[in-house]
Amino acid sequence: YSGRVLTEKETLKRYLQQAREALLWKLDGVSERDARWPMTPTGTNLLGIVKHVASVEIGYFGDIFGRPSGERLPWFADDAPDNADMWATVDESRADIIALYHRSWAHSDRTIDELTLDAPGTVPWWPPESRDVTLHRILVHMIAETARHAGHADIVRELIDGMAGVRADNSNLPDHDATWWAVYVASLQRVAEDAAQCPSPCRRRRSPSKPNGSSSANSRM
């Protein structure tokens, strides 16, 4: 954007794209097995998150504004099993889901570019009092939706292999090695154990002890 002040639509579109890329990056370097492996009691998995976000974005920027994408999404059919959009079948490869998400972006961006922010739409599955929407509202909603799921993916990926960070070129984490992080985590565990023994309200106010080499500039308090 060459340093110029962005329009409101450009700003919203930029934040949406940043959230999309942050989410998709979490699949980089993950095997087909690990991409599908359920990491929580409710089955949260990386590939399922991407499949879900790609699918709902197609709906929000498609049919809602009378601009159907033509994508076939059988996991949203009335007779589909619960949570069918939250996991990928054996026949749906990681490449398939990534390609779906890219097509979703392209279709959504055409809607965003061609409509005004006050363009009306209707979300039939929302409550009657709130289902009449504008493109502006759906953009904000989709930014929040994507960012929320990118956060889920961030934690899931860290649980899989320890990879963490906002995006490939900026982890947004203090620059320390695995030893430092192990000491840091151990210090938090000690604080948690101390807090469990502390009466409520706790009279002792303790902060985690800083591992060697930490500084106030990069500590995450």
For every predicted segment, state its role:
Residues Y1-S2, K9, K13-D28, E32-D82, ...:
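Short, contiguous alpha-helical
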Residues L117:
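Conserved, well-structured core segments that form or line functional sites
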